[in-house]
Amino acid sequence: GSGLVGSEMCIRDRAYTFTPDATIHSQAAILYNQDTQQILYEKNADQQQMPGHLVQIMTAIVVLQNCTDLDGTTITASDELYKTLYSYDEPDDLRYADIDNGDTLTVREYLYAMMLTSSCEASLILANQFGDGSIDGFVTKMNDTAAEIGCTATTFANPTGLYDTRQQTTARDMLTITNYALSLDGFEEIATATAFTPTTANPANHPDASAWNWTQANSMTLEDSSYYYEGAKGIKTGNLSKTGRSIITEATRDENTYLVILLNAPFEDADGKLQYYHLDDATSLLNWAFRSFAYTTLLESSEETAEVEVMNSDGNSYVLVHPKTDCVLLWCKSVDITAVQTV
């Protein structure tokens, strides 16, 4: 006979994306809600891009997976490892944390140096340690991990993020990588710190230990910056002079947390004037998200959404289908809810 059948049709498909009310200058972008795990906006999300220092998120992942004691494991810096940087073609891409030959730091301290300042020395020191004396061996671990966690268009060529045409990713893969990193103990605390001072300074190299500190490169998190954004945290910045400025940041307001992935915003506008479009884009997307989205019931559990034919039945030859529970999604207030089809 006829009856009501609960259906889970609505929760499974969250593939609604929306159009922001601002121009996004970055080559590729994703706006993602951490609470509902919805992608709310994407631009060229599957187009390959060079990630720059965003690579260091994967460097951190491999270290965290291979180091059981971040505070008890120390490494003494050897400039043999990073002498090659001195002859690098694009010196503007190099980032240093003032780590000198003979400095002994904990793995956690090297991770802070790398995540906050994009330190190339810290990246190479960590990669050498956890690649068992081989940077190439470490890069293999980076690529193996990317494949294991579901990246489909990412290849790593070095642990620093410096320019290499083989080094490619997508905004969608960077979302996968960042979410995986955030699931690991210790990552978020390090990547969202606003500053860090190492405690084991070598006095010969750093006579004024208190002056040796690292500040978060994401100026959206710094209260004295004109780009300060209330609720923003970390996670990673990355510039390459040949490709542009990139940033991944998260922000929380009113218990809603968004993650923004932005790859390769141009350095200049059409008139050749220096711009910080990656920060403009992040601000635009977050403002739009916090202003425009609300939890909305797309479908109530009492709503009948379809009639399904039943073969060989007594009496009525169909059942009425309705959702098991109310279907609630994050929805853009300016988009008419009646535009949603239930089938």
What are these regions (language model features)?
Residues 1, 28-30, 247-248, 259:
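Conserved beta-strand and immediately adjacent loop positions that scaffold enzyme active sites
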Residues 2-6:
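Positively charged, low-complexity/disordered segments
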Residues 7-8, 12-172, 178-185:
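Active-site-adjacent loops and short helices of periplasmic peptidoglycan-processing enzymes
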